[in-house]
C-alpha cells in the first residue's frame, strides 16, 4: 500500500472540516450582526427577531456537520485503502 494515501486522507479530513466551517461561521456572524442591528432599529420586534435568530443556526450548522461526516469517513472508513 502506498504510504501517501493515509497521509493525504488525514490532510483531506482536516481540510474538509476547516473549509466546511468557514461558510457557516461567516453566515452566523452576519446573521447575529443583522439581528442586533434590527433590534436596535425596532426594539418592539425583539421577540420575533430573537426567535428567528435562534432557529436559523441549526440549518447553518448542517454544512459543518456534513464536513465532519466526510472527515470521519476519510479517517475511519477510508475508501482509498
Swiss-Prot record:
Membrane topology listed for this record: Multi-pass membrane protein
Record's GO cellular component terms: plasma membrane; plastid membrane; proton-transporting ATP synthase complex; proton-transporting two-sector ATPase complex, proton-transporting domain
Membrane-spanning segments: 3-23, 61-81
Residues marked Reversibly protonated during proton transport (site): 61
SUPFAM superfamilies assigned to the protein according to its UniProt record, in alphabetical order: F1F0 ATP synthase subunit C
Keyword terms: ATP synthesis, CF(0), Hydrogen ion transport, Ion transport, Lipid-binding, Membrane, Plastid, Transmembrane, Transmembrane helix, Transport
One Pfam family in the UniProt entry: ATP-synt_C
Tagged with keyword Ribosomal protein: no
Localization, UniProt: Plastid membrane
Domain of life: Eukaryota
Family matches, as HAMAP family: ATP_synth_c_bact (MF_01396)
Miscellaneous comment: In plastids the F-type ATPase is also known as CF(1)CF(0).
Role: F(1)F(0) ATP synthase produces ATP from ADP in the presence of a proton or sodium gradient. F-type ATPases consist of two structural domains, F(1) containing the extramembraneous catalytic core and F(0) containing the membrane proton channel, linked together by a central stalk and a peripheral stalk. During catalysis, ATP synthesis in the catalytic domain of F(1) is coupled via a rotary mechanism of the central stalk subunits to proton translocation.
Protein name in UniProt: ATP synthase subunit C, plastid
Amino acid at each position: 500500500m502506498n504510504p501517501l494515501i493515509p497521509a493525504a486522507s488525514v490532510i483531506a479530513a482536516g481540510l474538509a472540516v476547516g473549509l466546511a466551517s468557514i461558510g457557516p461561521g461567516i453566515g452566523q456572524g452576519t446573521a447575529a450582526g443583522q439581528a442586533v442591528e434590527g433590534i436596535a432599529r425596532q426594539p418592539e420586534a425583539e421577540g420575533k427577531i430573537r426567535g428567528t435568530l435562534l432557529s436559523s443556526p441549526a440549518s447553518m450548522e448542517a454544512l459543518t456537520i456534513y464536513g465532519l461526516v466526510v472527515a470521519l469517513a476519510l479517517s475511519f472508513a477510508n475508501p482509498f485503502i
